[in-house]
C-alpha cells in the first residue's frame, strides 16, 4: 500500500492555471474520480478543489503509473498540456504525502498561514469521497489522523495570531485602531498578491470587501477565488468609493499615485488608509480625519511578530511530524496483525489436526476432545505470547522489515506487509 498526492496550489500555479484546473463542479469531480478509479493501480481517491489548490489524494499500488494517470486526466479536463502540468505539479509519496496532507489540513500550507477554512474544505472532500465510494479504509485512516493533527496544531499553537506580512500587519493595525472589524466595509485597491492577502485577512475578520481593479474581468476572477461575496468595482469609480468608506487598503503596482489630493473630500467620519505599495499609491494628503499609514509604519508590527511566528511554525511542524510518525506506527501495527493472526491460525490448525488423528487412531478417547482442545489452545497461546509481543514491539524499528520478511519466508506467508519507516524531517518554508 502506498500513498500519493498530486498537488497544484498558489505555490506552483498562477490564477489562470488554477482556474482551468478547478474541479468545483460536481460532475467534473465525478468524471475525474471515476476515470482514476478504473485504473488498476489506483485503489482510493479524494479530490480537494478550492480557490487556492487542487489536491488529488490517492492510495495506489504504483505511484509512477498513478501520477501519469492523474496528469493525463487533468490535462484532458483542463486543456493544459501534459508537459506543463508535469512541470508544475508537486508530487508527494508515502511519508511525504501524509506530511503534506496533515500540513494542508492544519493550515500550514495556506496562502494565509493558519487559516481555518481549509480544514472544513478537506472534511467536505472526504465526506463526498466516502459517500460516493471513492475512498475506504486506507484514506479514511489518513483523514482521521489529519483532523486530529489539525486540532492539536490549532489548540497548542498561536500560529494564526500574529501577522508577518505587510497585508496582515495592515489589517492587524486596523483592528488595533478600530476594535472589532466584523460588519465593516473595506476597500481593497489592487488585485495582485498583496491585495488578495489583504482581502483574505479582512474576510477572516468578518469585513465586507470591495475589491477595486483596472482589469474588471481579472478582478472578478480574483474575487471569486477568494470569496464569492466580494463586491467588485472598476478603478474609474475610485474617487466616489474612497470618500464613502472608513477603511482603505491599497496595493497596486502603479508607478504613480492612484489616489491624489484632488480626489479627496472632507467627511464627518474618521478614515483609516493603509498604503501597502512601494512606490506609494496614495499621494501625501493632509485632510482632517484621514489617518494614513505607509509600509514603514507597518514594518514594526511585522518585525515584532516574525520571531513569534517562526517559533509557532516550528511548534506546529513538530506536531505535524509527530502525527505523521504516529500514523505510520499505528498503520504498521495494523499491518503486522495479519501475520500474527496467520501464525496463530496455523498453530491452532496443526494442533487440532494432530488431535483428530490421535482420536481416530484410538490414542485419545473422544470424550476428552474438548478438554484437550482447551489444553492445546492454552499451550500454543503461551508459546506464542512472547514472540507476538516482541514482533509488535519492533514494528517501529528499522530491523522490522528484515525480521518480518524472515518470518514470512519460514512460514511461507504471502501476506503483503509494508514496514518501511521514514524519519519525518522537513525544513520550514515560512510564508506570510
Curated annotation (Swiss-Prot):
What else does the entry mention about this protein?
During catalysis, the active site Cys acts as a nucleophile attacking the alpha-carbonyl group of tRNA-bound glutamate with the formation of a thioester intermediate between enzyme and glutamate, and the concomitant release of tRNA(Glu). The thioester intermediate is finally reduced by direct hydride transfer from NADPH, to form the product GSA.
How does this chain assemble? Homodimer.
What job does the chain carry out? Catalyzes the NADPH-dependent reduction of glutamyl-tRNA(Glu) to glutamate 1-semialdehyde (GSA).
Q: What is its EC number?
A: 1.2.1.70
Gene that encodes the chain: hemA
Could you tell me which SUPFAM superfamilies the record lists for this protein?
Answer: Glutamyl tRNA-reductase catalytic, N-terminal domain, Glutamyl tRNA-reductase dimerization domain, NAD(P)-binding Rossmann-fold domains
The reaction(s) catalysed by this protein are: (S)-4-amino-5-oxopentanoate + tRNA(Glu) + NADP(+) = L-glutamyl-tRNA(Glu) + NADPH + H(+)
Matching entries from HAMAP family are given as:
Glu_tRNA_reductase
Instruction: Give the Pfam families listed for this entry.
Output: GlutR_dimer, GlutR_N, Shikimate_DH
**Pathway the protein contributes to:** Porphyrin-containing compound metabolism; protoporphyrin-IX biosynthesis; 5-aminolevulinate from L-glutamyl-tRNA(Glu): step 1/2
Record-listed substrate binding positions: 50-53, 110, 115-117, 121
Look up keyword Repeat and say if it applies: no
> What keywords would UniProt list here?
NADP, Oxidoreductase, Porphyrin biosynthesis
List the catalytic residues: 51 (nucleophile)
- Family classification: Belongs to the glutamyl-tRNA reductase family.
Q: Which GO terms describe its biological process?
A: protoporphyrinogen IX biosynthetic process from glutamate
Q: For binding NADP(+), which residues are annotated in this chain's numbering?
A: 190-195
Q: What is known of its domains?
A: Possesses an unusual extended V-shaped dimeric structure with each monomer consisting of three distinct domains arranged along a curved 'spinal' alpha-helix. The N-terminal catalytic domain specifically recognizes the glutamate moiety of the substrate. The second domain is the NADPH-binding domain, and the third C-terminal domain is responsible for dimerization.
Cited InterPro entries: 4pyrrol_synth_GluRdtase, 4pyrrol_synth_GluRdtase_dimer, 4pyrrol_synth_GluRdtase_N, GluRdtase_CS, GluRdtase_dimer_dom_sf, GluRdtase_N_sf, NAD(P)-bd_dom_sf, Shikm_DH/Glu-tRNA_Rdtase
- The record places the site described as Important for activity at 100
Gene Ontology terms, MF aspect:
glutamyl-tRNA reductase activity; NADP binding
Name of the protein described by the UniProt record: Glutamyl-tRNA reductase
User: What lineage is this protein's organism placed in?
Assistant: Bacteria, Pseudomonadati, Campylobacterota, Epsilonproteobacteria, Nautiliales
Amino acid at each position: 500500500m502506498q500513498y500519493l498526492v498530486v498537488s497544484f496550489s498558489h505555490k506552483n500555479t498562477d490564477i489562470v492555471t488554477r482556474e482551468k484546473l478547478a474541479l468545483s463542479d460536481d460532475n467534473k469531480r465525478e468524471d475525474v474520480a471515476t476515470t482514476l478509479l478504473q485504473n488498476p493501480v489506483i485503489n482510493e481517491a479524494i479530490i480537494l478543489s478550492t480557490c487556492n489548490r487542487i489536491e488529488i489524494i490517492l492510495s495506489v499500488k504504483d505511484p509512477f503509473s498513478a501520477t501519469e494517470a492523474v496528469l493525463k486526466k487533468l490535462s484532458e479536463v483542463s486543456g493544459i498540456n501534459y508537459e506543463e502540468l508535469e512541470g508544475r505539479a508537486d508530487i508527494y509519496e508515502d511519508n511525504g504525502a501524509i506530511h503534506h496532507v496533515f500540513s494542508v489540513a492544519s493550515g500550514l500550507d495556506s496562502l494565509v498561514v493558519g487559516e481555518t477554512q481549509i480544514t472544513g474544505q478537506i472534511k467536505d472532500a472526504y465526506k463526498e469521497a466516502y459517500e460516493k465510494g471513492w475512498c475506504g479504509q486506507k484514506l479514511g485512516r489518513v483523514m482521521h489522523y489529519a483532523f486530529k493533527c489539525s486540532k492539536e496544531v490549532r489548540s497548542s499553537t498561536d500560529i494564526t495570531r500574529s501577522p508577518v506580512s505587510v497585508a496582515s500587519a495592515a489589517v492587524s493595525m486596523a483592528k488595533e485602531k478600530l476594535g472589532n472589524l466584523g460588519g465593516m466595509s473595506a476597500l481593497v485597491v489592487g488585485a495582485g498578491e498583496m491585495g488578495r492577502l489583504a482581502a483574505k485577512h479582512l474576510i477572516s475578520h468578518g469585513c465586507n470587501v470591495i475589491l477595486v481593479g483596472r482589469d474588471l474581468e481579472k478582478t472578478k476572477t480574483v474575487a471569486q477565488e477568494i470569496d464569492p461575496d466580494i463586491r467588485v468595482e472598476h478603478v474609474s469609480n475610485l474617487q466616489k468609493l474612497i470618500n464613502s468608506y472608513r477603511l482603505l487598503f491599497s496595493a497596486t503596482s502603479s508607478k504613480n499615485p492612484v489616489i491624489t489630493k484632488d480626489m479627496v473630500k472632507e467627511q464627518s467620519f474618521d478614515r483609516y488608509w493603509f498604503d501597502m505599495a512601494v512606490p506609494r499609491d496614495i499621494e501625501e494628503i493632509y485632510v482632517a480625519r484621514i489617518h494614513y499609514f505607509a509600509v514603514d509604519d507597518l514594518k514594526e508590527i511585522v518585525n515584532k511578530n516574525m520571531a513569534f511566528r517562526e517559533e509557532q511554525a516550528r511548534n506546529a511542524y513538530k506536531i505535524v511530524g509527530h502525527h505523521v510518525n504516529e500514523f505510520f506506527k499505528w498503520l504498521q501495527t495494523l499491518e503486522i496483525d495479519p501475520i500474527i493472526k496467520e501464525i496463530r491460525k496455523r498453530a491452532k490448525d496443526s494442533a487440532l489436526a494432530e488431535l483428530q488423528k490421535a482420536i481416530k487412531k484410538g490414542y485419545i478417547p473422544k470424550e476428552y476432545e474438548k478438554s484437550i482442545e482447551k489444553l492445546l489452545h492454552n499451550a500454543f497461546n503461551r508459546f506464542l505470547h512472547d514472540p507476538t509481543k516482541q514482533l509488535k514491539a519492533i514494528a517501529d524499528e528499522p530491523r522490522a522489515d528484515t525480521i518480518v520478511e524472515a518470518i514470512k519466508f519460514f512460514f511461507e506467508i504471502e501476506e503483503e506487509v509494508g514496514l518501511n519507516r521514514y524519519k519525518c524531517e522537513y525544513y520550514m518554508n515560512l510564508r506570510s
